[in-house]
Amino acid sequence: MPTLPPLPDWVALEHQVAHLMTKQELHGWYFNERAAWQLASALQKELEETKKVLRERHPFVEGATFNPKRNNKTQGYFQGCESVRLKELNPTSRDHIAWILSTFYGWKPTQLTTTGKPVIDETILMETASAGITIAGDFAKCLDITKKLGMISEGTNAWLKLCTTASRVHHHCSVGCATFRMSHKNPNLAQVPSDPRFRQLFVPTPGQVMVGADLAGIELRMLAHYLARYDDGRYADILLNGDIHQVNADKIGIS
């Protein structure tokens, strides 16, 4: 029987990572369900209050145009008299948001989707609010709270839906991306908001201590580690003491 060659270092390392991630998934995160329900309730209340303010200001948006072909006294239609059917404002509808901003505040979109619709996201709305259209900030707030409620209680993979009777959340994490970065699912705990109200939901198991680490820039730090044998630590020095992004920009002439 032929002897198989030894595994390359990177394969052995990936296997070790897979082993650690499996242990993490089986162990799970201890989750404060009571605090999570309280936070979800508070966010829901805040969302409804914000929606109420927006609907009081703009109750309706423009719907479909209707041109009756004949008179209808019961419905109040008259042949040839075009009318517009109104829809109740949905403060989390991007189409409704774009219509309100452009119709009443003269907003001009700077980005369009592939289908030609204005791009509406929290970043654009906050920039619009900073430019003087303050109501855009309320729309951004609605989108943000809706997203957070999806994480906690309402989404398919909401934390509270996946929390076990033992108050644990067992999320899956693996080197699953084509770029060899980590992928997270069921639920995605890599996107927990930095807001302390959310971070405090994940607590140490009683009798244990939770230890955390800041992994900002982890990919470049790992690259610097493996480059050190070839560049005597030059890349690591730039990364830690300089601005690696500016160095890269200078190299390709886009400074």
Where do the model's predicted regions map?
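Conserved "right-hand" nucleotidyltransferase catalytic core of DNA-directed polymerases
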Residues: 1-197, 203-209, 216-219
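Poly-acidic low-complexity segments
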Residues: 32-33, 121, 231-234, 243-244
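Cytochrome P450 catalytic domain signature, combining two hallmark sequence patches
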Residues: 48, 106-113, 227-241
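Alpha-helical structural context
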Residues: 57, 104, 226, 251-252
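Secondary-structure transition/capping motifs at alpha-helix termini
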Residues: 61, 229-234, 252-255
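Short, solvent-exposed helix-helix connector turns and helix-capping sites enriched
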Residues: 93, 133, 229-232, 243
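Cytochrome P450 core scaffold surrounding the K-helix E-X-X-R motif
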Residues: 221-223
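Generic long, charged, amphipathic alpha-helical segments
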Residues: 240-255
